[in-house]
């Protein structure tokens, strides 16, 4: 756990090979990259806030793999982690983000007018649409490493900023610790609130310390715009609604996000960002846009088809179970979203989802009629 690692200097009394973790049964990005040599080279380093190599990798040591997705196996504890431990992070980022090089520059586009179509995904197949991202506030440690005081300060800042939103974004903040068990569970079941911190990835990285202190959810009155505070990231911004109007969801997302950033700037706070990695977040898998645009989509036939995984791969999409990352699909309903985060703009990623989902629906309709889908197979994007 972070904070117990203040004895990093004491560990250096042991040779690096005595401290090197056993990764022999591991299947995550960190385990693929971390060698005894790299460990020896980086283990004495720490960021200005005291985050060490062992803090970075602990979650990946404790969690060898995941049944549904290839996990990253490491986290950042502050903005400087990506620089101080770049010899570990850079190859992981390149591996996870489709060959994204240390010299590459990220691009941002939060103008919803640049999205082509997206307002007409068939609601007979698309049950709901959602776009989310994360944001980190510069000057604070990230959740694996932040103190109670930092976390409470982030919550206070977030609540002040969010309470200034108006129009259809106006809403209120609900602190986790003042919710009843039933209220919390209802919000989780409705997919509005993050789960209780039972995920081993959250626990092993130290993100669940002091739970539920200074955690909460802010949402507008009709629950189409939500902000999670102090879960895996300082802020998770989510726009969602029933049906297939991804254009509307994305427009609300861009408007709300831009307003939130402006409100933080008015208090002299900015979000962590740099030209190479885009928006800096706790998990390297979310760097860049941090954006996941997803739909819950009914594909009872295509979902069982042998080519389903190949189709998704070619469209640069990924599937999750109905209840999210740790679950299986129920009743032929899948959570389908963009696989990329970094190296593409927000508009490009949402466009991939919109175009890809249209094709998935066309394939599903063919299969309903007992027809072949070979001629619809997409080229690799």
Curated annotation (Swiss-Prot):
Disulfide bond entries: none
Known EC number(s)?
A: 2.7.3.2
**Could you tell me what reaction this enzyme catalyses?**
creatine + ATP = N-phosphocreatine + ADP + H(+)
Pfam families, sorted: ATP-gua_Ptrans, ATP-gua_PtransN
Q: Which GO terms describe its biological process?
A: futile creatine cycle; phosphocreatine biosynthetic process; substantia nigra development
One GO cellular component term of this record is:
cytosol
Annotated InterPro entries: ATP-guanido_PTrfase, ATP-guanido_PTrfase_AS, ATP-guanido_PTrfase_cat, ATP-guanido_PTrfase_N, ATP-guanido_PTrfase_N_sf, Gln_synth/guanido_kin_cat_dom
Query: What keywords are annotated for this sequence in UniProt?
Result: ATP-binding, Cell membrane, Cytoplasm, Isopeptide bond, Kinase, Membrane, Mitochondrion, Nitration, Nucleotide-binding, Phosphoprotein, Transferase, Ubl conjugation
* Cross-link Glycyl lysine isopeptide (Lys-Gly) (interchain with G-Cter in ubiquitin) placement: 45, 101, 107, 381
Query: Where does the record place the Phosphagen kinase N-terminal domain?
Result: 11-98
Q: Where is this region: Internal MTS-like signal?
A: 130-138
Please report the stretch or stretches of sequence annotated as the Phosphagen kinase C-terminal domain.
125-367
Q: Which residues carry this modification: Phosphotyrosine?
A: 125
Compositional bias per record (Basic and acidic residues), positions renumbered to this chain:
96-110
In the record, the effect of residue 292 to K is given as: 42% of wild-type activity
Q: Which residues carry this modification: 3'-nitrotyrosine?
A: 269
* Protein family according to the UniProt entry: Belongs to the ATP:guanido phosphotransferase family.
Function, as annotated, reads: Reversibly catalyzes the transfer of phosphate between ATP and various phosphogens (e.g. creatine phosphate). Creatine kinase isoenzymes play a central role in energy transduction in tissues with large, fluctuating energy demands, such as skeletal muscle, heart, brain and spermatozoa. Acts as a key regulator of adaptive thermogenesis as part of the futile creatine cycle: localizes to the mitochondria of thermogenic fat cells and acts by mediating phosphorylation of creatine to initiate a futile cycle of creatine phosphorylation and dephosphorylation.
Please state what the annotation says regarding this protein's domains: The internal MTS-like signal (iMTS-L) mediates targeting to mitochondria thermogenic fat cells.
Q: What is this protein called?
A: Creatine kinase B-type
| Natural source organism | Homo sapiens
Q: What is the lineage of its organism?
A: Eukaryota, Metazoa, Chordata, Craniata, Vertebrata
Q: Which gene is the coding source of this polypeptide chain?
A: CKB
